[in-house]
Amino acid sequence: MGSTAEDFVIKPMKGEHGFGAEIYGLDVNNITDEQVDRLRDTIQRYLLVVLKHQHDETPQKNWELLNRLSPDAPKFTPEEWALMYNPDPQGAGILPKLGYLVLPGTERLFLMGKGYQGEDHWGLKDIDIPEVFADAYYSKPLPHEDYHNGVARFQSWHIDGPSYKIDHPMFTSFRIIKFPEGEQTVDWADGSGLTKKVKAGRTAFFSSAKLYDMLTKEEQAIADYSWAEYMYFPYEWILRCRGNPQGLLVACEGREVPDEQMDAMPRNPEDQLVLPLVWVNPVTGGKHFHVQPNIVRRVFVRSGPDEEPKIIDDVKEVRDFFTKFQYRIIRPENIYVGPEEEGDQLLFFNWGVMHSKIDYPIEMGTRTTHQGWLAGDRPPKGPVPIPDPRARSSIYYQK
Protein backbone atom coordinates (compact mmCIF):
# COMPACT_ATOMS: atom_id res chain seq x y z
CA MET A 1 0.00 0.00 0.00
CA GLY A 2 1.15 3.56 -0.64
CA SER A 3 1.89 5.94 2.18
CA THR A 4 -0.84 8.42 3.09
CA ALA A 5 -0.47 12.17 2.78
CA GLU A 6 -0.10 12.39 6.56
CA ASP A 7 3.00 10.16 6.32
CA PHE A 8 4.70 12.52 3.89
CA VAL A 9 7.19 14.24 6.21
CA ILE A 10 9.31 17.19 5.04
CA LYS A 11 12.55 17.91 6.90
CA PRO A 12 14.25 21.12 5.69
CA MET A 13 17.99 20.85 5.25
CA LYS A 14 20.32 22.76 7.51
CA GLY A 15 23.35 24.65 6.31
CA GLU A 16 24.40 27.95 4.79
CA HIS A 17 23.50 26.86 1.26
CA GLY A 18 19.92 27.78 2.17
CA PHE A 19 17.75 25.34 0.22
CA GLY A 20 16.65 21.72 0.08
CA ALA A 21 14.64 19.24 2.14
CA GLU A 22 14.55 15.54 2.91
CA ILE A 23 11.26 13.69 2.51
CA TYR A 24 10.32 10.63 4.55
CA GLY A 25 7.37 8.27 4.26
CA LEU A 26 6.94 8.38 0.50
CA ASP A 27 6.95 5.27 -1.70
CA VAL A 28 7.43 6.20 -5.37
CA ASN A 29 6.19 2.77 -6.44
CA ASN A 30 2.80 3.51 -4.82
CA ILE A 31 2.54 7.31 -4.78
CA THR A 32 -0.98 8.81 -4.87
CA ASP A 33 -2.21 11.74 -6.97
CA GLU A 34 -2.57 13.82 -3.81
CA GLN A 35 1.05 13.13 -2.91
CA VAL A 36 2.25 13.98 -6.42
CA ASP A 37 0.52 17.37 -6.19
CA ARG A 38 2.07 18.06 -2.81
CA LEU A 39 5.47 16.86 -4.00
CA ARG A 40 5.35 19.15 -7.06
CA ASP A 41 4.72 22.14 -4.80
CA THR A 42 7.42 21.06 -2.33
CA ILE A 43 10.11 20.74 -5.00
CA GLN A 44 9.45 24.29 -6.18
CA ARG A 45 9.44 25.66 -2.64
CA TYR A 46 12.62 23.92 -1.47
CA LEU A 47 14.27 23.78 -4.94
CA LEU A 48 15.66 20.31 -4.23
CA VAL A 49 14.28 17.37 -2.26
CA VAL A 50 15.79 14.02 -1.31
CA LEU A 51 13.28 11.18 -1.21
CA LYS A 52 14.70 8.81 1.37
CA HIS A 53 14.69 5.01 1.20
CA GLN A 54 13.75 4.41 -2.44
CA HIS A 55 15.79 1.19 -2.74
CA ASP A 56 12.93 -0.79 -4.30
CA GLU A 57 11.83 1.79 -6.85
CA THR A 58 11.50 0.52 -10.42
CA PRO A 59 12.64 2.56 -13.45
CA GLN A 60 9.10 2.42 -14.82
CA LYS A 61 7.68 4.02 -11.65
CA ASN A 62 10.47 6.60 -11.70
CA TRP A 63 9.55 7.58 -15.26
CA GLU A 64 5.85 7.52 -14.40
CA LEU A 65 6.47 9.95 -11.53
CA LEU A 66 8.16 12.43 -13.88
CA ASN A 67 5.16 12.27 -16.19
CA ARG A 68 2.77 12.84 -13.30
CA LEU A 69 4.80 15.82 -12.08
CA SER A 70 4.67 17.36 -15.59
CA PRO A 71 1.48 16.00 -17.18
CA ASP A 72 1.40 18.67 -19.91
CA ALA A 73 5.01 18.22 -21.02
CA PRO A 74 5.32 17.99 -24.81
CA LYS A 75 6.00 14.56 -26.26
CA PHE A 76 8.64 13.72 -28.85
CA THR A 77 10.40 10.67 -30.23
CA PRO A 78 14.00 9.69 -29.45
CA GLU A 79 14.90 10.74 -33.00
CA GLU A 80 13.34 14.18 -32.50
CA TRP A 81 15.14 14.52 -29.18
CA ALA A 82 18.51 13.72 -30.77
CA LEU A 83 17.94 16.36 -33.47
CA MET A 84 17.64 19.02 -30.76
CA TYR A 85 21.34 18.52 -30.06
CA ASN A 86 22.59 18.12 -33.62
CA PRO A 87 20.78 18.27 -36.99
CA ASP A 88 22.77 15.28 -38.25
CA PRO A 89 20.32 12.33 -38.30
CA GLN A 90 23.25 9.90 -38.12
CA GLY A 91 23.82 10.94 -34.51
CA ALA A 92 27.12 12.77 -34.81
CA GLY A 93 28.21 15.12 -32.08
CA ILE A 94 27.60 15.41 -28.38
CA LEU A 95 25.14 12.53 -27.74
CA PRO A 96 27.46 9.66 -28.73
CA LYS A 97 30.16 11.25 -26.61
CA LEU A 98 27.85 11.20 -23.59
CA GLY A 99 26.87 7.58 -24.18
CA TYR A 100 23.32 7.78 -22.82
CA LEU A 101 21.65 4.40 -22.17
CA VAL A 102 17.85 4.29 -21.97
CA LEU A 103 16.41 1.98 -19.33
CA PRO A 104 13.97 -0.53 -20.86
CA GLY A 105 10.32 0.28 -20.26
CA THR A 106 10.94 4.03 -20.17
CA GLU A 107 11.24 6.69 -22.85
CA ARG A 108 14.16 8.76 -21.59
CA LEU A 109 15.19 7.55 -18.14
CA PHE A 110 18.91 6.99 -18.46
CA LEU A 111 21.41 4.72 -16.78
CA MET A 112 24.30 7.01 -15.91
CA GLY A 113 27.43 6.48 -13.88
CA LYS A 114 30.81 4.80 -14.20
CA GLY A 115 32.17 1.27 -14.20
CA TYR A 116 30.67 -2.18 -14.61
CA GLN A 117 26.92 -2.19 -14.00
CA GLY A 118 26.43 -5.96 -13.68
CA GLU A 119 25.28 -8.82 -15.86
CA ASP A 120 21.72 -7.50 -16.06
CA HIS A 121 20.74 -4.01 -14.91
CA TRP A 122 16.99 -3.75 -15.47
CA GLY A 123 17.40 -5.35 -18.89
CA LEU A 124 20.68 -3.70 -19.88
CA LYS A 125 23.26 -6.48 -20.24
CA ASP A 126 26.93 -6.33 -19.22
CA ILE A 127 27.19 -2.55 -19.34
CA ASP A 128 30.58 -1.05 -18.50
CA ILE A 129 30.44 2.76 -18.53
CA PRO A 130 33.84 4.28 -19.34
CA GLU A 131 35.31 7.53 -18.13
CA VAL A 132 34.11 10.29 -20.48
CA PHE A 133 35.48 13.67 -19.41
CA ALA A 134 37.44 12.81 -16.26
CA ASP A 135 40.58 14.84 -15.57
CA ALA A 136 41.30 15.88 -19.17
CA TYR A 137 38.41 18.34 -19.59
CA TYR A 138 39.83 21.51 -18.05
CA SER A 139 41.68 24.44 -19.61
CA LYS A 140 43.92 24.38 -16.55
CA PRO A 141 44.77 20.66 -16.43
CA LEU A 142 44.10 18.67 -13.29
CA PRO A 143 47.35 16.75 -12.81
CA HIS A 144 46.86 13.03 -13.27
CA GLU A 145 48.55 12.22 -9.97
CA ASP A 146 46.40 14.72 -8.07
CA TYR A 147 43.21 13.37 -9.65
CA HIS A 148 44.04 9.83 -8.57
CA ASN A 149 44.95 11.07 -5.09
CA GLY A 150 41.55 12.58 -4.39
CA VAL A 151 41.63 16.05 -5.96
CA ALA A 152 38.49 16.89 -7.94
CA ARG A 153 36.85 19.75 -9.84
CA PHE A 154 33.33 20.93 -10.49
CA GLN A 155 32.80 19.91 -14.10
CA SER A 156 30.19 22.30 -15.51
CA TRP A 157 27.45 24.32 -13.81
CA HIS A 158 24.39 23.86 -15.99
CA ILE A 159 20.62 23.58 -16.45
CA ASP A 160 19.24 20.31 -17.81
CA GLY A 161 17.89 20.17 -21.36
CA PRO A 162 19.20 20.88 -24.87
CA SER A 163 18.55 24.65 -24.49
CA TYR A 164 17.16 24.61 -28.02
CA LYS A 165 13.67 24.10 -29.46
CA ILE A 166 12.00 22.92 -26.24
CA ASP A 167 11.54 24.74 -22.95
CA HIS A 168 13.83 23.83 -20.09
CA PRO A 169 12.52 20.98 -17.95
CA MET A 170 11.03 22.00 -14.64
CA PHE A 171 11.92 18.82 -12.75
CA THR A 172 14.81 16.38 -12.91
CA SER A 173 14.84 12.99 -11.19
CA PHE A 174 18.19 11.57 -10.08
CA ARG A 175 18.04 8.26 -8.21
CA ILE A 176 21.16 6.85 -6.58
CA ILE A 177 21.64 3.08 -6.68
CA LYS A 178 25.37 2.68 -6.02
CA PHE A 179 28.07 5.13 -4.94
CA PRO A 180 31.86 4.78 -5.13
CA GLU A 181 33.75 4.86 -1.86
CA GLY A 182 36.02 7.49 -0.39
CA GLU A 183 36.32 11.26 -0.20
CA GLN A 184 37.68 13.95 -2.48
CA THR A 185 38.71 17.57 -2.19
CA VAL A 186 37.18 19.84 -4.81
CA ASP A 187 39.78 22.45 -5.74
CA TRP A 188 38.66 25.72 -7.37
CA ALA A 189 42.17 25.96 -8.92
CA ASP A 190 41.53 29.54 -10.02
CA GLY A 191 43.79 31.39 -7.60
CA SER A 192 41.09 31.77 -4.93
CA GLY A 193 42.48 29.01 -2.70
CA LEU A 194 38.95 27.68 -2.17
CA THR A 195 38.34 23.96 -1.61
CA LYS A 196 35.49 21.74 -0.41
CA LYS A 197 35.55 18.21 1.01
CA VAL A 198 33.00 15.90 -0.64
CA LYS A 199 32.09 12.24 -0.79
CA ALA A 200 32.91 10.64 -4.14
CA GLY A 201 30.25 10.30 -6.81
CA ARG A 202 27.99 13.09 -5.57
CA THR A 203 26.50 16.06 -7.43
CA ALA A 204 26.84 19.76 -6.55
CA PHE A 205 24.03 22.34 -6.51
CA PHE A 206 23.56 26.04 -5.81
CA SER A 207 20.42 28.16 -5.55
CA SER A 208 19.94 30.82 -8.21
CA ALA A 209 17.52 32.56 -5.81
CA LYS A 210 20.36 33.01 -3.33
CA LEU A 211 22.50 34.31 -6.18
CA TYR A 212 19.87 36.93 -7.02
CA ASP A 213 19.77 38.01 -3.38
CA MET A 214 23.55 38.46 -3.41
CA LEU A 215 23.36 41.05 -6.21
CA THR A 216 23.43 44.77 -5.48
CA LYS A 217 20.28 46.80 -6.15
CA GLU A 218 21.88 48.16 -9.32
CA GLU A 219 22.77 44.65 -10.47
CA GLN A 220 19.28 43.41 -9.69
CA ALA A 221 17.82 46.13 -11.91
CA ILE A 222 20.06 45.04 -14.78
CA ALA A 223 19.15 41.41 -14.16
CA ASP A 224 15.42 42.14 -14.05
CA TYR A 225 15.29 43.98 -17.37
CA SER A 226 17.92 42.16 -19.46
CA TRP A 227 17.71 38.96 -21.49
CA ALA A 228 19.89 36.35 -23.18
CA GLU A 229 19.90 34.73 -26.60
CA TYR A 230 21.14 31.15 -26.41
CA MET A 231 23.13 29.66 -29.28
CA TYR A 232 21.31 27.20 -31.54
CA PHE A 233 22.58 23.64 -31.10
CA PRO A 234 24.60 25.07 -28.20
CA TYR A 235 26.34 21.87 -27.14
CA GLU A 236 27.66 21.34 -30.65
CA TRP A 237 28.93 24.92 -30.58
CA ILE A 238 31.03 24.29 -27.45
CA LEU A 239 31.77 20.61 -28.08
CA ARG A 240 35.53 21.18 -28.36
CA CYS A 241 35.73 23.79 -25.60
CA ARG A 242 37.48 23.13 -22.31
CA GLY A 243 36.01 24.03 -18.95
CA ASN A 244 37.19 26.59 -16.46
CA PRO A 245 38.61 24.87 -13.37
CA GLN A 246 35.76 25.88 -11.02
CA GLY A 247 33.10 24.70 -13.50
CA LEU A 248 31.64 28.10 -14.39
CA LEU A 249 31.55 28.76 -18.14
CA VAL A 250 34.06 27.41 -20.63
CA ALA A 251 37.45 28.89 -21.35
CA CYS A 252 37.71 31.46 -24.14
CA GLU A 253 40.33 29.73 -26.27
CA GLY A 254 38.73 29.99 -29.70
CA ARG A 255 37.66 26.34 -29.65
CA GLU A 256 34.00 27.05 -30.47
CA VAL A 257 32.69 25.75 -33.78
CA PRO A 258 33.17 28.67 -36.22
CA ASP A 259 30.13 30.84 -36.94
CA GLU A 260 30.08 29.96 -40.63
CA GLN A 261 29.97 26.26 -39.78
CA MET A 262 27.19 26.79 -37.25
CA ASP A 263 25.24 28.94 -39.72
CA ALA A 264 25.36 26.11 -42.25
CA MET A 265 23.42 23.80 -39.92
CA PRO A 266 19.75 23.50 -40.95
CA ARG A 267 17.53 24.96 -38.29
CA ASN A 268 14.37 26.92 -37.54
CA PRO A 269 15.31 30.37 -36.15
CA GLU A 270 12.18 30.36 -33.99
CA ASP A 271 13.55 27.36 -32.09
CA GLN A 272 16.44 29.41 -30.70
CA LEU A 273 15.80 30.25 -27.04
CA VAL A 274 15.61 33.87 -25.91
CA LEU A 275 15.06 34.08 -22.16
CA PRO A 276 15.07 36.56 -19.30
CA LEU A 277 18.08 36.55 -17.00
CA VAL A 278 15.73 36.32 -14.01
CA TRP A 279 13.17 33.52 -13.75
CA VAL A 280 10.28 33.96 -11.32
CA ASN A 281 9.44 30.92 -9.20
CA PRO A 282 5.78 30.10 -10.01
CA VAL A 283 5.06 28.89 -6.46
CA THR A 284 7.00 31.29 -4.22
CA GLY A 285 7.20 34.34 -6.49
CA GLY A 286 10.93 34.51 -5.70
CA LYS A 287 13.43 35.74 -8.26
CA HIS A 288 16.22 33.51 -9.58
CA PHE A 289 19.22 34.76 -11.57
CA HIS A 290 19.09 31.73 -13.80
CA VAL A 291 21.39 31.61 -16.82
CA GLN A 292 23.64 28.92 -18.24
CA PRO A 293 26.37 31.26 -19.42
CA ASN A 294 28.60 28.93 -21.42
CA ILE A 295 25.97 28.57 -24.17
CA VAL A 296 24.73 32.18 -24.40
CA ARG A 297 25.59 33.81 -27.73
CA ARG A 298 24.33 37.35 -27.08
CA VAL A 299 23.06 39.31 -24.10
CA PHE A 300 20.78 42.36 -24.22
CA VAL A 301 21.55 44.63 -21.28
CA ARG A 302 19.37 47.35 -19.81
CA SER A 303 18.37 48.47 -16.31
CA GLY A 304 14.89 49.84 -16.94
CA PRO A 305 11.85 49.40 -19.19
CA ASP A 306 12.48 52.48 -21.32
CA GLU A 307 16.17 51.89 -22.02
CA GLU A 308 17.42 50.76 -25.40
CA PRO A 309 19.40 47.60 -24.62
CA LYS A 310 23.12 47.39 -25.13
CA ILE A 311 23.80 44.29 -27.23
CA ILE A 312 26.89 42.30 -26.24
CA ASP A 313 27.78 39.78 -28.95
CA ASP A 314 31.52 39.31 -28.50
CA VAL A 315 31.79 35.84 -26.95
CA LYS A 316 34.46 36.81 -24.43
CA GLU A 317 32.54 39.92 -23.37
CA VAL A 318 29.36 37.85 -22.95
CA ARG A 319 31.21 35.43 -20.68
CA ASP A 320 32.90 38.23 -18.76
CA PHE A 321 29.46 39.77 -18.15
CA PHE A 322 28.09 36.58 -16.63
CA THR A 323 31.24 35.83 -14.67
CA LYS A 324 30.80 39.20 -12.94
CA PHE A 325 27.28 38.23 -11.87
CA GLN A 326 27.63 34.52 -11.14
CA TYR A 327 31.12 33.85 -9.80
CA ARG A 328 30.18 35.13 -6.31
CA ILE A 329 27.87 32.16 -5.66
CA ILE A 330 30.59 29.56 -6.32
CA ARG A 331 31.79 29.35 -2.74
CA PRO A 332 31.89 26.30 -0.44
CA GLU A 333 29.22 27.55 1.93
CA ASN A 334 26.71 28.14 -0.90
CA ILE A 335 27.00 24.67 -2.43
CA TYR A 336 25.09 21.54 -1.45
CA VAL A 337 26.77 18.27 -2.46
CA GLY A 338 24.74 15.10 -2.24
CA PRO A 339 22.80 13.05 -1.67
CA GLU A 340 24.23 11.11 1.23
CA GLU A 341 23.06 7.53 0.83
CA GLU A 342 22.39 4.84 -1.72
CA GLY A 343 18.64 4.58 -2.22
CA ASP A 344 18.21 8.34 -2.05
CA GLN A 345 16.39 10.00 -4.92
CA LEU A 346 16.98 13.65 -5.78
CA LEU A 347 14.17 15.63 -7.37
CA PHE A 348 15.23 19.16 -8.18
CA PHE A 349 13.63 22.27 -9.63
CA ASN A 350 15.62 22.83 -12.78
CA TRP A 351 14.37 26.44 -12.93
CA GLY A 352 15.73 27.19 -9.46
CA VAL A 353 19.09 25.44 -9.01
CA MET A 354 22.12 24.86 -11.16
CA HIS A 355 24.15 21.71 -10.77
CA SER A 356 27.49 20.17 -11.65
CA LYS A 357 28.95 16.71 -11.83
CA ILE A 358 32.09 16.02 -9.77
CA ASP A 359 34.13 13.35 -11.50
CA TYR A 360 36.21 10.71 -9.74
CA PRO A 361 38.73 8.01 -10.82
CA ILE A 362 37.31 4.57 -11.52
CA GLU A 363 39.44 2.88 -8.87
CA MET A 364 37.13 4.45 -6.24
CA GLY A 365 34.37 2.13 -7.42
CA THR A 366 31.23 1.87 -9.51
CA ARG A 367 28.61 4.60 -9.67
CA THR A 368 25.07 3.70 -10.73
CA THR A 369 22.29 6.26 -11.14
CA HIS A 370 19.01 6.71 -13.00
CA GLN A 371 18.39 10.21 -14.34
CA GLY A 372 15.58 11.71 -16.40
CA TRP A 373 13.57 14.83 -17.14
CA LEU A 374 10.69 16.00 -19.32
CA ALA A 375 10.60 19.18 -21.36
CA GLY A 376 8.91 22.17 -19.77
CA ASP A 377 5.29 22.76 -20.73
CA ARG A 378 5.95 26.51 -20.94
CA PRO A 379 8.88 28.93 -20.87
CA PRO A 380 9.95 30.53 -17.60
CA LYS A 381 8.62 34.01 -16.90
CA GLY A 382 10.74 36.97 -15.94
CA PRO A 383 9.74 39.90 -13.74
CA VAL A 384 9.07 42.06 -16.83
CA PRO A 385 8.19 41.20 -20.44
CA ILE A 386 10.98 40.83 -22.98
CA PRO A 387 10.71 40.95 -26.79
CA ASP A 388 8.82 37.88 -27.98
CA PRO A 389 11.36 35.05 -28.28
CA ARG A 390 9.10 32.97 -30.52
CA ALA A 391 8.34 35.67 -33.11
CA ARG A 392 11.67 36.87 -34.46
CA SER A 393 10.32 40.18 -35.78
CA SER A 394 12.07 42.47 -33.31
CA ILE A 395 14.88 44.61 -34.66
CA TYR A 396 17.03 43.27 -31.81
CA TYR A 397 17.32 39.93 -33.59
CA GLN A 398 18.43 41.22 -36.98
CA LYS A 399 22.11 40.46 -37.46
UniProtKB/Swiss-Prot annotation:
It comes from Phomopsis amygdali (Fusicoccum amygdali). Residues 371-399 are annotated as: Disordered. 2-oxoglutarate binds at T203, R367. Fe cation binds at H158, D160, H355. Its cofactor is Fe(2+). Its EC number is 1.14.11.-. Gene3D superfamilies: Clavaminate synthase-like (3.60.130.10). The keyword Metal-binding applies. Binds 1 Fe(2+) ion per subunit. It is an enzyme of class 1 (oxidoreductase). The gene is fc-dox. GO terms for molecular function: dioxygenase activity; metal ion binding. The keyword DNA damage does not apply. Belongs to the TfdA dioxygenase family. The lineage of its organism: Eukaryota, Fungi, Dikarya, Ascomycota, Pezizomycotina. Pathway: Mycotoxin biosynthesis. This is Alpha-ketoglutarate-dependent dioxygenase fc-dox. Alpha-ketoglutarate-dependent dioxygenase; part of the 2 gene clusters that mediate the biosynthesis of fusicoccins, diterpene glucosides that display phytohormone-like activity and function as potent activators of plasma membrane H(+)-ATPases in plants by modifying 14-3-3 proteins and cause the plant disease constriction canker. It holds the Pfam family TauD. InterPro entries: TauD-like_sf, TauD/TfdA-like, TfdA_dioxygenase. It comes from the Eukaryota. PANTHER family: ALPHA-KETOGLUTARATE-DEPENDENT XANTHINE DIOXYGENASE XAN1 (PTHR43779:SF2), DIOXYGENASE RV0097-RELATED (PTHR43779).
